[in-house]
Amino acid sequence: MQHFWVVGTDTDVGKTIVTTLLMCQLQRLGLEIIPFKPVQTGEIYDNLHSYYADTAMYEKYSLQVLNKEHMNGYSFKEAASPHFAAQLEGQQIDVENLLQRIQFLQESYDVVIAEGAGGLFVPLDVQQSITLLDVIVSSKLPVVLVTRTTLGTINHTLLTMEALQSRQIDVLGIVFNGDTGSMMEQDNIHTILQYHPLPYAIIPRLQDISELANINITHTTLFERLYGNDPRNN
Protein backbone atom coordinates (compact mmCIF):
# COMPACT_ATOMS: atom_id res chain seq x y z
CA MET A 1 0.00 0.00 0.00
CA GLN A 2 0.95 3.59 -0.50
CA HIS A 3 1.15 6.31 2.13
CA PHE A 4 -0.61 9.51 1.13
CA TRP A 5 -2.02 12.88 2.10
CA VAL A 6 -5.66 13.92 2.15
CA VAL A 7 -5.78 17.58 1.14
CA GLY A 8 -8.61 19.96 0.35
CA THR A 9 -9.49 22.90 -1.83
CA ASP A 10 -10.38 24.85 1.31
CA THR A 11 -11.18 24.46 4.99
CA ASP A 12 -14.28 22.47 5.93
CA VAL A 13 -14.51 20.61 2.62
CA GLY A 14 -14.54 17.26 4.40
CA LYS A 15 -10.90 16.23 4.73
CA THR A 16 -11.46 14.63 8.12
CA ILE A 17 -14.53 12.75 6.90
CA VAL A 18 -12.57 11.40 3.94
CA THR A 19 -9.52 10.56 6.05
CA THR A 20 -11.70 8.67 8.51
CA LEU A 21 -13.60 6.89 5.76
CA LEU A 22 -10.45 5.76 3.96
CA MET A 23 -8.95 4.67 7.27
CA CYS A 24 -11.95 2.44 8.01
CA GLN A 25 -12.20 1.00 4.50
CA LEU A 26 -8.51 0.06 4.51
CA GLN A 27 -8.68 -1.32 8.05
CA ARG A 28 -11.41 -3.71 6.91
CA LEU A 29 -8.84 -5.20 4.54
CA GLY A 30 -6.61 -6.09 7.48
CA LEU A 31 -4.12 -3.27 7.02
CA GLU A 32 -2.65 -1.38 9.96
CA ILE A 33 -3.55 2.26 9.35
CA ILE A 34 -2.58 5.44 11.18
CA PRO A 35 -4.29 8.74 10.42
CA PHE A 36 -1.93 11.63 11.14
CA LYS A 37 -2.95 15.26 11.58
CA PRO A 38 0.31 17.26 11.55
CA VAL A 39 -1.40 20.39 12.86
CA GLN A 40 -4.90 20.76 14.27
CA THR A 41 -6.54 23.83 15.73
CA GLY A 42 -9.75 24.57 17.61
CA GLU A 43 -10.02 22.86 20.98
CA ILE A 44 -13.60 21.95 21.90
CA TYR A 45 -14.92 21.98 25.47
CA ASP A 46 -17.84 19.73 26.32
CA ASN A 47 -18.96 19.04 29.90
CA LEU A 48 -15.52 19.62 31.40
CA HIS A 49 -14.00 17.45 28.67
CA SER A 50 -11.82 18.95 25.96
CA TYR A 51 -10.93 17.43 22.61
CA TYR A 52 -10.07 18.20 18.99
CA ALA A 53 -12.65 17.25 16.38
CA ASP A 54 -10.26 15.70 13.85
CA THR A 55 -8.42 13.21 16.05
CA ALA A 56 -11.61 12.53 18.03
CA MET A 57 -13.31 11.41 14.82
CA TYR A 58 -10.40 9.12 13.97
CA GLU A 59 -10.69 7.45 17.35
CA LYS A 60 -14.47 7.19 17.32
CA TYR A 61 -14.74 5.36 14.00
CA SER A 62 -11.46 3.43 13.89
CA LEU A 63 -11.77 -0.35 13.75
CA GLN A 64 -8.36 -0.62 15.40
CA VAL A 65 -6.97 0.86 18.61
CA LEU A 66 -5.05 3.97 17.60
CA ASN A 67 -1.92 5.21 19.33
CA LYS A 68 -2.79 8.77 20.39
CA GLU A 69 0.85 9.84 20.29
CA HIS A 70 1.02 8.87 16.62
CA MET A 71 -2.07 10.76 15.46
CA ASN A 72 -0.99 14.37 15.84
CA GLY A 73 2.00 16.67 15.67
CA TYR A 74 0.71 19.98 17.04
CA SER A 75 -2.60 21.00 18.62
CA PHE A 76 -3.54 24.62 19.25
CA LYS A 77 -6.58 25.88 21.12
CA GLU A 78 -7.63 28.72 18.80
CA ALA A 79 -9.66 27.74 15.72
CA ALA A 80 -7.45 29.66 13.30
CA SER A 81 -4.75 29.27 10.69
CA PRO A 82 -1.90 27.18 12.18
CA HIS A 83 0.64 30.01 12.08
CA PHE A 84 -1.66 32.33 14.05
CA ALA A 85 -2.91 29.69 16.46
CA ALA A 86 0.69 28.76 17.25
CA GLN A 87 1.66 32.41 17.69
CA LEU A 88 -1.12 32.92 20.24
CA GLU A 89 0.44 30.19 22.39
CA GLY A 90 4.00 31.41 21.89
CA GLN A 91 4.95 28.36 19.87
CA GLN A 92 6.51 27.64 16.50
CA ILE A 93 5.78 24.70 14.24
CA ASP A 94 8.93 22.69 13.56
CA VAL A 95 8.47 21.47 10.00
CA GLU A 96 11.51 19.19 10.13
CA ASN A 97 10.01 17.51 13.18
CA LEU A 98 6.75 16.94 11.29
CA LEU A 99 8.61 15.39 8.37
CA GLN A 100 10.57 13.13 10.72
CA ARG A 101 7.31 12.06 12.36
CA ILE A 102 5.79 11.20 8.99
CA GLN A 103 8.87 9.19 8.05
CA PHE A 104 8.77 7.30 11.36
CA LEU A 105 5.09 6.47 10.86
CA GLN A 106 5.77 5.19 7.34
CA GLU A 107 8.22 2.71 8.82
CA SER A 108 5.74 1.64 11.50
CA TYR A 109 2.41 1.21 9.67
CA ASP A 110 1.06 -0.29 6.47
CA VAL A 111 -0.53 3.02 5.52
CA VAL A 112 -0.11 6.55 6.84
CA ILE A 113 -2.92 8.94 5.91
CA ALA A 114 -1.69 12.46 6.62
CA GLU A 115 -4.50 15.00 6.72
CA GLY A 116 -3.80 18.58 5.72
CA ALA A 117 -5.02 21.68 7.55
CA GLY A 118 -7.15 24.10 5.55
CA GLY A 119 -6.06 24.59 1.94
CA LEU A 120 -2.66 24.03 0.37
CA PHE A 121 -1.27 27.50 0.96
CA VAL A 122 -2.12 27.82 4.64
CA PRO A 123 1.01 29.24 6.33
CA LEU A 124 2.72 27.35 9.13
CA ASP A 125 4.99 30.12 10.42
CA VAL A 126 4.53 33.78 11.32
CA GLN A 127 6.91 34.83 8.55
CA GLN A 128 4.51 33.07 6.17
CA SER A 129 7.49 31.51 4.40
CA ILE A 130 6.46 27.88 4.89
CA THR A 131 3.10 26.50 3.82
CA LEU A 132 1.37 23.15 4.07
CA LEU A 133 2.19 22.67 0.40
CA ASP A 134 5.91 22.94 1.18
CA VAL A 135 5.58 20.13 3.71
CA ILE A 136 3.73 17.96 1.20
CA VAL A 137 6.45 18.52 -1.39
CA SER A 138 9.18 17.66 1.11
CA SER A 139 7.37 14.50 2.24
CA LYS A 140 7.42 13.18 -1.36
CA LEU A 141 4.02 11.57 -0.80
CA PRO A 142 1.08 11.63 -3.23
CA VAL A 143 -2.27 13.17 -2.37
CA VAL A 144 -5.99 12.53 -2.51
CA LEU A 145 -7.83 15.78 -3.18
CA VAL A 146 -11.15 16.52 -1.45
CA THR A 147 -13.46 19.08 -3.00
CA ARG A 148 -17.05 20.22 -2.80
CA THR A 149 -19.74 19.60 -5.39
CA THR A 150 -21.42 22.99 -5.01
CA LEU A 151 -21.17 26.25 -6.94
CA GLY A 152 -17.58 27.49 -7.18
CA THR A 153 -15.97 24.08 -6.94
CA ILE A 154 -14.79 24.02 -10.55
CA ASN A 155 -12.57 27.05 -10.10
CA HIS A 156 -11.33 26.01 -6.64
CA THR A 157 -10.55 22.48 -7.78
CA LEU A 158 -8.74 23.48 -10.97
CA LEU A 159 -6.62 26.04 -9.10
CA THR A 160 -5.69 23.45 -6.49
CA MET A 161 -4.85 20.89 -9.15
CA GLU A 162 -2.64 23.43 -10.90
CA ALA A 163 -0.75 24.10 -7.67
CA LEU A 164 -0.21 20.38 -7.08
CA GLN A 165 0.79 19.46 -10.61
CA SER A 166 3.14 22.41 -11.04
CA ARG A 167 5.10 20.96 -8.12
CA GLN A 168 5.08 17.43 -9.56
CA ILE A 169 2.90 16.09 -6.75
CA ASP A 170 1.14 12.88 -7.75
CA VAL A 171 -2.63 13.20 -7.36
CA LEU A 172 -4.06 9.73 -6.75
CA GLY A 173 -7.62 10.87 -7.21
CA ILE A 174 -10.42 13.22 -6.24
CA VAL A 175 -13.19 12.87 -3.66
CA PHE A 176 -16.31 14.90 -4.34
CA ASN A 177 -17.86 15.44 -0.92
CA GLY A 178 -21.38 16.50 0.00
CA ASP A 179 -23.21 15.55 -3.19
CA THR A 180 -27.00 15.95 -3.19
CA GLY A 181 -27.49 14.67 -6.72
CA SER A 182 -28.55 17.96 -8.30
CA MET A 183 -28.00 18.54 -12.01
CA MET A 184 -25.59 21.38 -11.29
CA GLU A 185 -23.49 19.21 -9.00
CA GLN A 186 -23.36 16.39 -11.54
CA ASP A 187 -22.21 18.86 -14.18
CA ASN A 188 -19.57 20.24 -11.79
CA ILE A 189 -18.22 16.74 -11.24
CA HIS A 190 -18.30 15.94 -14.96
CA THR A 191 -16.54 19.19 -15.86
CA ILE A 192 -13.74 18.70 -13.34
CA LEU A 193 -13.19 15.14 -14.54
CA GLN A 194 -13.07 16.38 -18.12
CA TYR A 195 -10.13 18.59 -17.14
CA HIS A 196 -8.56 15.93 -14.92
CA PRO A 197 -9.70 12.36 -15.72
CA LEU A 198 -8.52 10.89 -12.43
CA PRO A 199 -9.85 8.08 -10.25
CA TYR A 200 -12.60 9.46 -8.04
CA ALA A 201 -15.24 8.79 -5.42
CA ILE A 202 -18.45 10.65 -4.59
CA ILE A 203 -19.69 10.97 -1.02
CA PRO A 204 -23.29 12.06 -0.47
CA ARG A 205 -24.20 14.87 1.87
CA LEU A 206 -24.52 13.41 5.36
CA GLN A 207 -27.46 14.51 7.48
CA ASP A 208 -25.59 13.25 10.53
CA ILE A 209 -21.94 12.33 10.88
CA SER A 210 -22.93 8.91 12.24
CA GLU A 211 -24.01 8.03 8.67
CA LEU A 212 -20.31 7.83 7.85
CA ALA A 213 -20.28 4.25 9.14
CA ASN A 214 -22.66 3.24 6.33
CA ILE A 215 -20.67 4.73 3.44
CA ASN A 216 -18.78 2.28 1.22
CA ILE A 217 -16.37 3.49 -1.46
CA THR A 218 -14.49 0.24 -2.07
CA HIS A 219 -16.19 -0.06 -5.48
CA THR A 220 -14.88 3.31 -6.70
CA THR A 221 -11.99 3.92 -9.07
CA LEU A 222 -10.27 5.93 -6.33
CA PHE A 223 -10.22 3.03 -3.90
CA GLU A 224 -9.07 0.70 -6.66
CA ARG A 225 -6.17 3.08 -7.28
CA LEU A 226 -5.24 3.18 -3.59
CA TYR A 227 -5.53 -0.53 -2.85
CA GLY A 228 -4.31 -1.55 -6.27
CA ASN A 229 -0.93 0.02 -5.46
CA ASP A 230 -0.34 -2.73 -2.90
CA PRO A 231 2.07 -5.27 -4.44
CA ARG A 232 0.50 -7.94 -2.23
CA ASN A 233 -2.57 -7.77 -4.48
CA ASN A 234 -0.62 -8.67 -7.63
UniProtKB/Swiss-Prot annotation:
UniProt keyword annotations, A-Z: ATP-binding, Biotin biosynthesis, Cytoplasm, Ligase, Magnesium, Metal-binding, Nucleotide-binding
Single GO MF descriptor: magnesium ion binding
Residue sites binding Mg(2+) per the record: T16, D54, E115
EC number(s) recorded for this UniProt protein: 6.3.3.3
Active site: K37
Catalytic activity field: (7R,8S)-7,8-diammoniononanoate + CO2 + ATP = (4R,5S)-dethiobiotin + ADP + phosphate + 3 H(+)
Binding-site positions, substrate: T41
Localization in the cell: Cytoplasm
GO biological process: biotin biosynthetic process
Source organism superkingdom: Bacteria
Annotated Gene3D superfamilies: P-loop containing nucleotide triphosphate hydrolases (3.40.50.300)
Pfam families noted in UniProt: AAA_26
Pathway: Cofactor biosynthesis; biotin biosynthesis; biotin from 7,8-diaminononanoate: step 1/2
Positions annotated to bind ATP: D12, V13, G14, K15, T16, I17, D54, E115, G116, A117, G118
Matching InterPro entries: DTB_synth_BioD, P-loop_NTPase
Family membership: Belongs to the dethiobiotin synthetase family.
Function: Catalyzes a mechanistically unusual reaction, the ATP-dependent insertion of CO2 between the N7 and N8 nitrogen atoms of 7,8-diaminopelargonic acid (DAPA, also called 7,8-diammoniononanoate) to form a ureido ring.
Subunit structure: Homodimer.
Name of the protein in question: ATP-dependent dethiobiotin synthetase BioD
Annotated organism of origin: Lysinibacillus sphaericus (strain C3-41)
